Each structure stands twice: as C-alpha cells, then as structure tokens.
Amino acid sequence: MIKDESKFWREFKEDTPEISWTRIENSVSLGTPDLLGYNNNGYFFTVELKVAKSNKVRLSPHQIAFHVRHPMSTFILVKDVKNSRLCMYVGRQVKDLLACGLSLVVGIFGI
C-alpha cells in the first residue's frame, strides 16, 4: 500500500499546483497526516492520503486519534480504486468513515 500511496501523492501534487505542499515524514510523530497544505487564502491544513481497494478505509489508531483531537482543517483523501474516484472527508468524519467505509457521504465536493 505504501507504493500506491506514494504514487497517489505524486499525482495529487501535480494536480494541485495552486497549493503549497509539505510532505510530512511520519516516523517522528505517529498519526500525523501525510501532507501539510497552504492555500492562496493563507490557510494551513493537513491531509491524510489513503488508497482503498475495497469499501474499507484503513487508518491506524494513531491516525484516528489525530483526527478526533483535530477535527477542523484536517482532511482524509481516499483514492477509491474500485470506483475510480477521489473521496475527501473532513477530520470530524473519521469515526463515521471507519464505520461506513466509502459508502459514507463525501464531506467535500468538487475535487
């Protein structure tokens, strides 16, 4: 899955040149999202990248805890391989995402 997420990151970075991205190495702090973004409106936010080959989205307990503690300005972006789509959820949806998987209504539209 690591190779899939690395490829997803490269594609995502190319498709979002208007955002300044910093890739975060997670060996320092477990659960910290993969990306720190900064947009043209002057806002920082984090994104956890996931590649799902089924309805289930796999998140570690540390990743879940991060989004529970930081429900705002945090996102989980899932590449749904089976249905060829991107699904973005806001951090506060993390528990629902675990319970419902990709059948959960997407939290952000237009990506």
Language model segments and positions:
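Acidic-basic catalytic patches of nuclease active cores, encompassing PD-(D/E)XK
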Residues: 1-26, 40
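Short, charged, amphipathic alpha-helix that recurs within catalytic cores of restriction-modification
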Residues: 52-79
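Beta-rich catalytic cores
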Residues: 31
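Helix-rich interaction surfaces within compact, conserved domain-sized segments
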Residues: 93-111
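Nucleic-acid nuclease catalytic cores
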Residues: 69-96
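Histidine- and/or cysteine-centered catalytic micro-motif in compact active-site loops
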Residues: 24-27, 50-52
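Structural signal for conserved beta-strand scaffold positions within catalytic alpha/beta enzyme cores
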Residues: 23, 48, 76-78
